[in-house]
């Protein structure tokens, strides 16, 4: 596991990343619950998902939305958090160019952002 500070739209985004041993492994971005209600990348279910995806052979990243932990910026009611997620997904895809499978998963608020990210990705295809 590697600690990262990824450049984001409102400053640095704190992340934890585990790279698979396989060059063509699937990738996954994990999104945490509502920051305004105490959600972080360390939330129990997000941490467990992180471990499960690593065990399944995925290159896996979880991160804190803006204003949480070491991530810079302020909570933006979902709009800015979607930008954060898109930025982290872009970083992950650029770092794993041989991956053909990409997942995005979240819990509660994180699932809502994940669905928006999927819709945004479909628009840009």
Task: Give each language-model segment a name.
Residues 53, 117-118:
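Aromatic pocket-lining residues of Rossmann-like dinucleotide-binding sites
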Residues 85, 114-117:
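Hydrophobic packing residues within well-ordered alpha-helices of enzyme cores
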């Amino acid at each position: 596991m590697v600690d990262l500070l990824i450049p984001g739209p409102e400053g640095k985004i704190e992340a934890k990343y585990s790279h698979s041993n396989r060059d063509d492994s699937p990738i996954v971005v994990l999104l945490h619950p509502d920051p305004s209600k105490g959600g972080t990348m360390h939330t129990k279910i997000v941490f467990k998902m992180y471990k499960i995806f690593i065990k399944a052979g995925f290159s896996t990243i979880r991160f804190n939305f803006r204003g949480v932990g070491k991530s810079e910026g302020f909570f933006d009611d979902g709009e800015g958090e979607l930008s954060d997620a898109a930025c982290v997904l872009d970083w992950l895809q650029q770092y794993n160019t041989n991956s053909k499978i990409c997942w995005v998963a979240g819990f509660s608020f994180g699932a809502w952002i994940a669905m928006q990210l999927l819709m945004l990705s479909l628009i840009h295809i």
